[in-house]
Amino acid sequence: MTEPIESIEVSLGDRSYPIWISTGLTESAEQPHFAKHFQAAVGDCTHVVLIHDAAVSNTIASRVEKQLEQAGIRITSISIPSGETSKSVSKLESIWNVMLESGTDRRSVVVAVGGGVVGDLAGFAAASFTRGLRFVQVPTTLLSMVDSSVGGKTGINLPGGKNMVGSFWQPQMVWIDTQSLSTLPDRDFISGMAEVIKYGVIEDAEFFCWLQDKAARLIEKDPETLRYAIRKSCESKARVVAEDERETSGRRAILNYGHTFAHAIEATAGYGVCLHGEAVSIGMQMAAHLAIDMELCDRSLLEEQTAVLSAAKLPLAWKDADPEKMLPVMSHDKKVSHGKLRFVLPDRIGHVAMVGDVPSEKVIAAILACRDEPN
């Protein structure tokens, strides 16, 4: 039987924080679990800037707002349209202006309620306004629960690249209520599965084996199975972040498996056309093809990865993949060193390595391998 609430610690010294995982504990105004954990995490607070996805304005965001108001906290509510196009300079500026007009100061706390877009945008607003405000994440999508809400990466997109402007800004707390997944559209839920599967490939072979057996139940949103997958994913993310918070040792870069290709797919397709998790799934396939071509692993790894991604109903190929458009975008990837592309590539299930000086013709071949037909 799953406990009513579970916790995972992100160990970063005096900036450590908890990830709370529950089901339905944001629902009750009579038992304000969120407000109590919020106050324990942030301490004294009389003003919250609640930045939320418009899609959850009348559900979990309104419940969070009600609990905080009942605790005597003044709320400034900012609704953000869904989609990657909201991660823009203009949207960030509009948030800053509302914060200024509402009397936001260094004692205020920013609370992000929504998916990865809202978390990234609100986190960067918190990091930059008055040189830094306390920040709390309330992720409402599978992808944001297992990935973007944990680790402190915040930022916005530029026309030429994803997440090109941002900062590391750790939250005071991450509050995951899996009940919010019950209303998440199937496409968005499945998109998040890519990041769950990623953890098995990069770091946890035992978890990957579990996913091979449980992918179908996850798609059905079986509560116990879902809670376990979220907890295991958060444990992996917390472990890697604790070892390399700001990507100085290279350890944290393993979390970018498939992402060099994925970000180029998103940018060339147009933000929002291909969901992030969908792009990551295709990017993982491209990375596996590249690893085979670089003789880092044999084809069985690709076959195992393909089987799990397929079971999760994730895309394996993108018919519009164009190396001529993708390579220039990839040249701006943050893992580029001395003008050379570097890739996170698997050598076996449960382990990846950073590989540099990859010939461009091999990158092109990997892209083309995932263009015309499923693997």
From Swiss-Prot:
A molecular-function term among this protein's GO annotations: nucleotide binding
Organism domain of life: Bacteria
Principal localisation: cytoplasm
GO terms under cellular component: cytoplasm
Names of required cofactors: NAD(+); Co(2+); Zn(2+)
Residues where Zn(2+) binds: 195, 259, 276
Cofactor binding comment, as recorded: Binds 1 divalent metal cation per subunit. Can use either Co(2+) or Zn(2+).
Catalytic reactions of this protein: 7-phospho-2-dehydro-3-deoxy-D-arabino-heptonate = 3-dehydroquinate + phosphate
Subcellular location(s) of the protein: Cytoplasm
One Gene Ontology biological process: amino acid biosynthetic process
Keyword Zinc among UniProt keywords: yes
Enzyme Commission number(s) of this protein: 4.2.3.4
Record keywords, A-Z: Amino-acid biosynthesis, Aromatic amino acid biosynthesis, Cobalt, Cytoplasm, Lyase, Metal-binding, NAD, Nucleotide-binding, Zinc
Residues bound to NAD(+): 82-87, 116-120, 140-141, 153, 162
Biochemical pathway: Metabolic intermediate biosynthesis; chorismate biosynthesis; chorismate from D-erythrose 4-phosphate and phosphoenolpyruvate: step 2/7
Function comment: Catalyzes the conversion of 3-deoxy-D-arabino-heptulosonate 7-phosphate (DAHP) to dehydroquinate (DHQ).
Similarity-based family: Belongs to the sugar phosphate cyclases superfamily. Dehydroquinate synthase family.
Name of the molecule in the record: 3-dehydroquinate synthase
Organism whose genome encodes this protein: Rhodopirellula baltica (strain DSM 10527 / NCIMB 13988 / SH1)
Lineage: Bacteria, Pseudomonadati, Planctomycetota, Planctomycetia, Pirellulales
